[in-house]
Amino acid sequence: MASQYFAILTDYGTQAFAKALSSKQPLQLATFAVGDGNGQAVTPTENRTALVREKHRANVSAVTLDPRNNKQVIVELTIPEDVGGFYIREMGVFDNQNKLIAYANSPESYKPTEGSGSGKVQVLRMVLLVSSSNAV
């Protein structure tokens, strides 16, 4: 059975990783965005250039290499408790040129704010399968 939730490199992201490897210049994963898919579940496609409906974007919190698989890069976003009031159904990672590198769908999750009576810090991770983690 195929995975219902997954992350993919966009067409641009695939080219950017290849260029980073060939030029030996690391790819700068700069920002991480979340969106609500305009109220609908989304399916990742390589030709995507933006989230369906972006709700929050911030600098990437961390980029790490998977210690068990050197072809996986883990990108993290921490959303503080004072940001929210929306559902999360999609995620995207952007480079320092504001171009979408990777896109993922996720199970629907509500991100509350403290003002609603239930604030929480939320950490999201996107795991990217790449040909070589040397590009990051």
Please report, for each region that a protein language model flagged, where it lies by residue:
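N-terminal assembly/attachment segments of tailed bacteriophage virion structural proteins
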Residues: 1-136
